[in-house]
A protein has these predicted regions:
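Domain-level signature for soluble enzymes in the chorismate/prephenate branch of the shikimate pathway
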Residues: 1-224
């Protein structure tokens, strides 16, 4: 079947950006339609009756492992990365080994008749993930005030400054910028940036149009 929207996690308050998703936004030719923040609750899950001292390794999605790094270090556990937390919980159930635990949800523990050995184990008590809804065609949300763009610059001194200067001169607030290496290039980078603004504002539209004309690569990911 076909779906109009997908949901992807782009950033976590503890572990930072999910770089693979940023790559997918560019490589998959996707646009951002909206965003929302959600509190993420992680539990340590194992065979019923397991004591923490019995656990030697923990399995989960890489982001969950990063978000729970303090407890993993405290218990001295080795880590194994899995494609998602549900797969990790199933892995523990299939292994039926007290030395292996998973990071996942209490619901997943119930599904596989496992036990929550320790609850809410994220390093940060305010463990929040930002999710975006994505689609193929650009869709501006009602009341949109956030703009996401991706661009590259020429590899010459001052090139990034010249990109950012128009934002300052027009009072456009830059809330985030980070770089990602371009695969197969010799230390060339894509820059992902979030701005405060609305593309229906003539000043904002003018700045973005100028950048699109001047830069080697420029894409408006979304206004939401």
């Amino acid at each position: 079947g076909e779906v109009e929207y997908g949901i992807l996690p782009v950033e976590n308050s503890c572990a930072g950006s999910v770089h693979e998703v940023y790559d997918l936004l560019m490589d998959g030719d996707l646009c951002i339609a909206n965003s929302a923040d959600a509190h993420i609750h992680h539990d340590l899950i194992g065979i019923k009756g397991t004591r923490l001292v019995e656990i030697k390794e923990v399995v989960s999605h890489p982001q969950a492992l990063k978000q729970c790094a303090a407890l993993i270090s405290e218990l001295g556990l080795s880590v194994i990365e899995m494609s998602n937390t549900a797969v990790a919980v199933k892995y523990v159930a299939d292994r039926n080994d007290r030395s292996v635990a998973a990071i996942g949800s209490a619901e997943a523990a119930d599904d596989y008749s496992l036990e929550v050995l320790k609850s809410d184990i994220a390093t940060s008590r305010n463990n929040t993930t930002r999710f975006v809804s994505v689609c193929r065609e650009p869709k501006r949300s009602a009341g949109a005030d956030k703009i996401s763009i991706v661009f590259s610059t020429e590899n010459v001194p001052g090139s990034l400054y010249r990109v950012l200067a128009p934002f300052a001169s027009t009072d456009m607030s830059l809330t985030k910028i980070e770089s990602r290496p371009i695969a197969g290039s010799d230390f060339d980078y894509l820059f992902y940036a979030d701005l405060k603004g609305d593309v229906t504002d003539p000043v904002v539209a003018g700045v973005l149009a100028t950048l699109k004309m001047q830069l080697p690569c420029f894409k408006l990911l979304g206004n939401y």
